[in-house]
């Protein structure tokens, strides 16, 4: 499968989305997020298992995984999408050392364009931990609207997460 090149509007940045392969999954699996963000370390395990068992592109639940490169940096993030009944649920991960560098919004918008071109959905949705205000700010700027909250426990600690949606 060919690499999909996308250029962030108004920037010199060039994002490339490619089907997730084993090398990318292993590299992303080694990322370590600090503090309470460490809960996102676990989120990469299904990605690794999926690529080991089924090869690139998708897992058994129909989630498509992409490795994202930027300019000469071969792996700045992971992006997932799952199409269900007119909605595409996305997952967005940025390499820990790149957080806070104003990459989130252009990266997210380009990922949404890829999902829109692939599935022609009516809506996009995502789930985010409520403590992750940096991500929530990016998602809000991209037009996502906060929705229902759900509680969960990770390593004995209580968290809330919310689903956010926006029209495609």
Residue ranges and their predicted role:
Residues 1-26, 30, 168:
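Conserved N-terminal entry element of GNAT/NAT acetyltransferase domains
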Residues 2-3, 34, 44, 151:
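Class I (Rossmann-like) S-adenosyl-L-methionine-dependent methyltransferase catalytic domain
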Residues 6-9, 56-58, 79-80, 153-154:
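Short secondary-structure boundary/capping segments
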Residues 15, 88-90, 124:
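Conserved beta-strand core positions
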Residues 19-23, 30-91, 95-99, 108, ...:
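Acetyl-CoA-dependent GNAT
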Residues 92-109, 129-137, 141:
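Conserved glycine-rich acetyl-CoA-binding loop
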Residues 121-136, 141-168:
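C-terminal "cap" of GNAT-fold acetyltransferases
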């Amino acid at each position: 499968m060919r690499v999909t090149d996308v250029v962030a509007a108004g920037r010199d940045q060039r994002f490339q989305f490619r089907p997730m392969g084993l090398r990318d999954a292993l590299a992303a699996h080694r990322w370590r997020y600090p503090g309470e963000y460490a809960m996102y370390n676990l989120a990469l395990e299904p990605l690794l298992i999926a690529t080991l068992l089924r090869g690139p592109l998708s897992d058994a639940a129909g989630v498509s995984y992409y490795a994202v490169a930027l300019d000469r940096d071969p792996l700045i993030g992971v992006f997932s999408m799952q199409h269900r009944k007119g909605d595409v649920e996305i997952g967005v991960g940025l390499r820990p050392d790149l957080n806070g560098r104003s990459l989130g919004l252009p990266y997210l918008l380009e990922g949404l364009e890829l999902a829109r071109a692939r599935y022609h959905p009516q809506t996009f949705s995502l789930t985010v931990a409520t403590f992750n205000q940096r991500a929530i700010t990016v998602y809000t700027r991209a037009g996502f609207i906060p929705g229902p909250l759900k509680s969960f426990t990770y390593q004995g600690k209580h968290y809330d997460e919310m689903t956010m949606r926006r029209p495609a």
